[in-house]
Design a protein with these regions (language model features):
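Non-transmembrane, aqueous-exposed alpha-helical and coiled segments at domain scale
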Residues: 1-299
Length: 299
């Protein structure tokens, strides 16, 4: 393919993939919702879970977005330095969002700040957001897609703790956020926690944590133990599906971390709602692609 044909091909695939993720949940989210439904003992929660699952069935059957809020589109990119379209990637992802907005369709969710007008295309200044990670000597491009809806974005919080607060302080911060804001974020939630030096590094890590598969664990045993502790603690709050009470509050807690300054503990929380619309696609140098988040999908 020529360069222009490559760009057109990848744009088309990404537009279709973005639209698809708004209609069909990833395999791990679907499986977790079904598992939580089976374990639920509250009659009201059972009805809500049944409605959630029926909603997803109809979204796929009718080829419509599963939630009216299709969010602001975000991409987390891990791109090799030898990938043929690395220089064109941001522009083509922008075009893919414009195309998906019409074809899927997606709700118009890009409002220019201060000027306060909706662009009508789901693109604007800095939108879609692209978070980059460059991989040396690789010719592949891994792209996580995410629909950041209003409800699941509202609980997002970050702060820097004094080191004396320790990991008890991290735990307290996460639980405070969940008890104060989790109710209205459409639970059961996937909770992403970032621990680093400052607010921006912790916040980005908490977003990356939401891309991890449900049921995965931090490679550090202490961090993995804290994931389980937080999951158990938040579940005991009993938010239940849609915040209407029940046995569970979350689908899981994922922690991502970096080394930190000895004088600070930066911590951030991001959450994904029950309709956690993430996707993961990997392109090789010939633009063949593999979708890992949704089985049996090809465009």
């Amino acid at each position: 393919m020529s360069k222009s044909e490559q760009i057109s091909h990848m744009t088309d695939v990404m537009a279709k993939f973005v639209g698809y993720t708004g209609k069909v949940l990833p395999d791990d989210v679907t499986a977790k919702l079904e598992d939580l439904h089976k374990k639920e003992t509250s009659k009201l929660a059972d009805v809500i879970f049944t409605t959630m699952i029926e909603n997803q069935r109809l979204a796929k059957e009718l080829d419509r977005p599963s939630c009216q809020d299709t969010g602001v589109i975000q991409f987390l990119v891990e791109c090799g330095t030898n990938f043929p379209l690395i220089g064109e990637l941001e522009a083509l992802l922008r075009e893919a969002v414009i195309k998906a907005t019409v074809d899927s369709p997606l709700r118009h969710n890009s409002v220019e700040t201060f000027d306060e007008y909706n662009t009508g295309k789901n693109v604007g200044k800095g939108t879609p957001t692209v978070f980059w990670e460059i991989i040396p000597n690789s010719d592949q491009c891994s792209i996580y897609t995410y629909m950041a809806g209003g409800g699941c974005s509202l609980p997002g919080k970050a702060m820097v703790l004094m080191p004396g607060a320790g990991y008890e302080g991290v735990t307290r911060f996460v639980l405070d956020v969940m008890t104060s804001y989790g109710l209205n974020a459409c639970p059961p939630l996937l909770v992403g926690v970032g621990v680093a030096t400052s607010v921006e590094t912790a916040a980005l890590l908490s977003k990356k944590a939401l891309m991890r598969p449900i049921g995965s664990h931090n490679e550090n045993e202490r961090a993995a133990s804290l994931e389980k502790m937080l999951e158990d603690g938040i579940n005991k709050i009993g938010l239940g599906p849609q915040g209407m009470s029940g046995n569970t509050s979350v689908m899981g807690v994922n922690i991502e971390n970096t080394a930190r300054h000895p004088s600070t503990i930066g911590v951030a929380v991001n959450v994904g709602c029950w309709s956690h619309r993430k996707g993961h696609i990997v392109f090789d140098k010939d633009l063949n692609y593999t979708i890992t988040s949704h089985s049996g999908v090809n465009f």
